Amino acid sequence: MYVSMLFGFSYVFWLIGVSSNISVYYGVVSLVCTAGTGCVVLAWKGGSFLALVLFLIYLGGMLVIFAYSITLVMEPFPEVMGDWVGVMHAGKYVVLAVVFVLVGWGWWGVGECGDGVVDAGGLSIVRVDSSGLSLLYAIGGGALMMAMFGLFLTFFIVLVLVQGLFRVACPTI
């Protein structure tokens, strides 16, 4: 119970970091940590295969885009989160998160949530989550190929867009 609450609060903490970033560098790190803690929450609840697939697809596809975004920005002196502006942005989102928790506690019945997992129905020879790999390659093979093609196409589009801007932004290289 306490571990899932710890990762839940960590997830909200990193989401606040994503939404209140004042520099691209901290936003990317916060987004990667948000994905990591979200996948840990999924794995803790019993969806280990889903967490692994989401984490690998997310990091494999999106970090390429983030790397090119950081290359485009090239801030020599990025602002830090400890600056007054960053503290004010983070404070707004913390207050908003606290209000959502207080309002949602009564409306959505958050207090009744337990620490049940996917396999809480009883003992079984095969876990519910372990059949995901065979289904991914059997039924979901076409969708997997389309996602791969989309990521590949996005990679080349961003590469072409960044190519001309990189020469303008960094004339010394």
Curated annotation (Swiss-Prot):
It is found in: Mitochondrion membrane. Its EC number is 7.1.1.2. It is an enzyme of class 7 (translocase). Keywords: Electron transport, Membrane, Mitochondrion, NAD, Respiratory chain, Translocase, Transmembrane, Transmembrane helix, Transport, Ubiquinone. It holds the Pfam family Oxidored_q3. GO terms for molecular function: NADH dehydrogenase (ubiquinone) activity. Its main location: mitochondrion. The chain crosses the membrane at residues 12-32, 47-67, 94-114, 142-162. One of its GO terms (cellular component) is mitochondrial membrane. It catalyses: a ubiquinone + NADH + 5 H(+)(in) = a ubiquinol + NAD(+) + 4 H(+)(out). It is a multi-pass membrane protein. InterPro entries: ComplexI_Subunit6, NADH_UbQ/plastoQ_OxRdtase_su6. Core subunit of the mitochondrial membrane respiratory chain NADH dehydrogenase (Complex I) that is believed to belong to the minimal assembly required for catalysis. Complex I functions in the transfer of electrons from NADH to the respiratory chain. The immediate electron acceptor for the enzyme is believed to be ubiquinone. Belongs to the complex I subunit 6 family. This is NADH-ubiquinone oxidoreductase chain 6. It comes from Pelomedusa subrufa (African side-necked turtle). The gene is MT-ND6.
